[in-house]
UniProtKB/Swiss-Prot annotation:
PANTHER family: GLYCINE DEHYDROGENASE (DECARBOXYLATING), MITOCHONDRIAL (PTHR11773:SF1), GLYCINE DEHYDROGENASE, DECARBOXYLATING (PTHR11773). It comes from Pyrococcus horikoshii (strain ATCC 700860 / DSM 12428 / JCM 9974 / NBRC 100139 / OT-3). Gene3D superfamilies: 6.20.440.10, Aspartate Aminotransferase, domain 1, Type I PLP-dependent aspartate aminotransferase-like (Major domain). It catalyses: N(6)-[(R)-lipoyl]-L-lysyl-[glycine-cleavage complex H protein] + glycine + H(+) = N(6)-[(R)-S(8)-aminomethyldihydrolipoyl]-L-lysyl-[glycine-cleavage complex H protein] + CO2. The gene is gcvPB. One of its GO terms (biological process) is glycine decarboxylation via glycine cleavage system. This is Probable glycine dehydrogenase (decarboxylating) subunit 2.
Amino acid sequence: MYRQARWDEPLIFELSRPGRVGYTLPKPIEDVKVEIPEKLKRKTPLELPEVSEPEVVKHYTRLSEMNYGVDSGIYPLGSCTMKYNPKINEEIANHPKVAFIHPYQDERTVQGALKIMWELEQWLKEITGMDRFTLQPAAGANGEFTGVMIIKAYHLDRGDTQRTEILVPDSAHGTNPASASMAGFKVVEIPSNENGTVDLEALENAVSERTAGLMLTNPNTLGIFEDEIEEIAKIVHKVGGLLYYDGANLNGILGKVRPGDMGFDIVHLNLHKTFSTPHGGGGPGAGPVGVKEFLKDYLPVPLVSYDEENDRYYLDYNVPKSIGKVKELFGNFAVLVKALTYLKIMGKEGLREVSEVAVLNANYLARKLKGTRGYELPHKELRKHEVVFSAEPMKKETGVRTLDVAKRLLDFGLHAPTIYFPLIVHEALMIEPTESVSKEELDAYVEALKKISEEAYTNPEIVKSAPHNTAVRRVDDVLAAKKPVITWKMYKELKEKGEIDY
């Protein structure tokens, strides 16, 4: 049985002692006097912890022992594609010629960097069937917002001011309606049919002269391929709308079929999902947006272009109807480097194999778990890259909820899947193993879920009170939401006031 390390580790600020030094800055070659305007000068000293290098190493090593990441084991968060992040990516991205260039350098001195961005765009165009890409967006949701703003700009440019609605399936990512709303659109929800795919009759009834576009993930968040996608495209295009592809689940069709060939006009991708760059604190992310030829003039500026005659790459601001910038400078460059490294190493055949193994793994897990007491597999049996089970029967029969199952999985040293999503599946367990996971890891995951089922029906309290073997047990979610303590300054002030006692 798994046992996670548990350290009573203080914050690094609490380890601070005056005079302790972990790093000494080199002395300047000569005295440099800089006149800093008074309004820019700090009024109080900068509060940085004073700790030695050994203390820093021990502190973060202990914290890492209370953590779990993709290098620890299976991390099957559905619709997140938590695949292995190859270490060669980091090695290339940390090369001095990558790490120490500056975005304000003259173009002539960063031709290699611009070439990397240009080459990455060519790969993404080939993979998706799009004609032009911006690499600016910093994340998937940032990419979504960019794509929706392009839809808006396109319709306004044509004088179609009545197009105020974005259609979104009921199985969509939560960021889809959020992005559409932020762009000023009314969101119209399209229900799923009994197969878990878009209900064509409902879509036909929803489209109108007010339709700006439809946002769709394919495969969808149930892991099911929208096999009527060509008909969906016809319905949307017939009324003058655009079809937007949320690339969150591209890993399930990589190298097999292209969004552009399905009828999509706009695509956003997640380099931190499909193309192996790290998520979250290991990131940042990147959410490139690709468009068909007729939309390229609306992309954010600048684009990266190539002057063949002079063999020169350059930042291209000649984008007549651009929506402007969606991020400062030119995107998260180090992430772009990591993604291109992955693409070059994998090659076309390797990328095709990625989707084949990802789909095989998801279906193997689904088949092995299907029929286990308390878990139900709604909709179609055959899935792509992920599978969504419902633990509603278990909840009704034992009182054990999906949340309890997820917490109990941690006791086995396994990361929980995405839970309670998509919303159309009650007590959802959304499992995406990715291609990085071995058969042995899949078997262990299924056995843990089966063991939890057995416990739920024989000793439900052990599941309801889980986890038992982790550094942190159940946190107070309500308190965290009502009284967030997210900085050292907030923590210190609240503690001085006696409002927190930890």
